[in-house]
Regions:
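Gram-negative outer-membrane beta-barrel transporters
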Residues: 1-91, 160-164
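Transmembrane beta-barrel architecture of outer membranes
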Residues: 60-64, 110-112, 154-158
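Structural motif
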Residues: 70-71, 105, 118-119
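Short amphipathic alpha-helical interaction segments
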Residues: 103-107, 111-114, 149, 153
Length: 165
């Protein structure tokens, strides 16, 4: 494709709030934030229409944040994800062709929530993914099962039971 320049910043904050506010082994509150801001551009290319374009599959913004709350045998987790628009080809095609193979990947956000209960060696968990029920896609397949976009799953819920030996 050519030569590209990528630069930006990424940081992770993982903060145990309960250690700061409470003196309790039964209570836990943890916050995390993982954020990146990446600028990516082709600085030279022998191909027409590529120089100056954003590098494909490199979103400008990527953010994941969440909060975990634990009290005795109970735990809940809330996680939010945001991903900015990105391109799937070096020409930065915005509109999809008929095959769906080229074109941009629109921005999306996702909210997940789960609740757990621990007793002896068992963990019981109930949760939901994609609670905002927004439809998005993160890939454009050129072959199987495509060609075309691969949509995200719909809002879903789960129940699990785990036993630790």
């Amino acid at each position: 494709m050519g030569d590209a320049l990528l630069y930006g910043q990424e940081f992770l904050i993982n903060f145990n709030i309960s250690n700061l506010l409470f003196d309790s082994k039964d209570l836990g509150i943890n916050y995390f934030l993982n954020f990146s801001n990446i600028n990516s551009n082709y600085v030279s290319s022998e191909l027409n229409g590529v120089e100056g374009n954003q590098v494909e599959f490199v979103p400008k913004l990527n953010c994941k944040t969440g909060l975990d709350f634990k009290f005795k045998n109970f735990k809940s987790s809330l996680q939010y994800t945001f991903m900015s628009k990105q391109f799937t080809d070096a020409t930065n095609s915005i509109e999809s062709d008929l095959s769906g193979v080229i074109g941009s990947l629109p921005k999306y956000d996702v909210l997940d929530l789960s609740f757990s209960y621990f007793i002896n060696n068992f963990e019981f968990e109930f949760g939901g993914n994609k609670l905002l029920d927004k439809h998005y896609f993160t890939n454009r397949a050129t072959g199987y099962p495509g060609p075309g976009i691969i949509p995200s799953p719909n809002r879903n819920f789960f129940i699990t039971m785990q036993y630790k030996f």
